[in-house]
Amino acid sequence: PDTLPEDPCYVAVLTNIMEHPADVIDFSNQKVVTNAAREILLISRSPIPYPKGTRDFEYEKVTGIQLYSKQALAFYHATPKSILEKAEENDMMRFIENGHKVHAIVSPYKTVSVDTPKDLALVNTILKEKQHG
């Protein structure tokens, strides 16, 4: 967004559009579903939304880059982990389950999360290609 919303407990995450079908079923990728205002409705490691009625949508994943207002950090510190946060291992669920909006901002730049040895190998390959390419 161009300006920060009125909510003093402001949280936003950077996302990327997923380009490869295999990434959608990879549990290390946290997928998001948003409403028309780009507020996150759900974050899951499962493929969401499930393509039962249509495949006319893009899967979006969390990059790991997050923005918190001072009030959001205070809320996070003072509030225990939520049920879905524990299940999905995603701290954004703490805000969502407690009624705070989390905004998703799609980045035009592709990012790589480094959460597994496979991710690290991919980053090393990318860096080698940049050095020699």
Predicted regions and their residues:
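Conserved alpha/beta core of the MobA/IspD/sugar-nucleotide pyrophosphorylase nucleotidyltransferase superfamily
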Residues: 57-133
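Conserved core of the sugar-phosphate nucleotidyltransferase
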Residues: 1-80
